Amino acid sequence: KATGIAGIYYAVQMANFGLLSEAEYRAFGEPYDRRILAAVADCWFNMVHLHGRAGMFDLVAQYGVHALNWHDRESGPSLAEGVQRFGGAVSGGLEHWDDILRGDPDGLRRLVHEAVEHTGGRRLIVSSGCVAPVNAPFSNLRAIRQAVGEIVR
């Protein structure tokens, strides 16, 4: 089946201990997540975003996607723990409000380097743990990109 897509970025908002127990999510959420992800399983790259500060990381880490993004700077696990508990790429290292919106270029460069250190530079996609604000200063976004470019040379 031709879809014309390379994959999806799938946001999971209810797999959150502040909203449901793990048993409740396994009954009422996980089956639907898995049906959606099964429909795109043959795509080249699928990523799940685990939304919220009390996400069910270990449950979602079993979804069989290529990358997992979560609020790593606001809640657990850390990137270092995440790369140990999830077999694919981890996506994070930056907090969307304090770092990307209100931070400064030098601080962001430092955080990019920390993310690389915490993961050993393997299986890492440097990103925010949630959406990047549309009003984030371009100088901050440029600093993030430049820091990544310096590392991957």
What is the predicted role of each segment?
Residues 1-153:
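Active-site loop segments of alpha/beta catalytic cores
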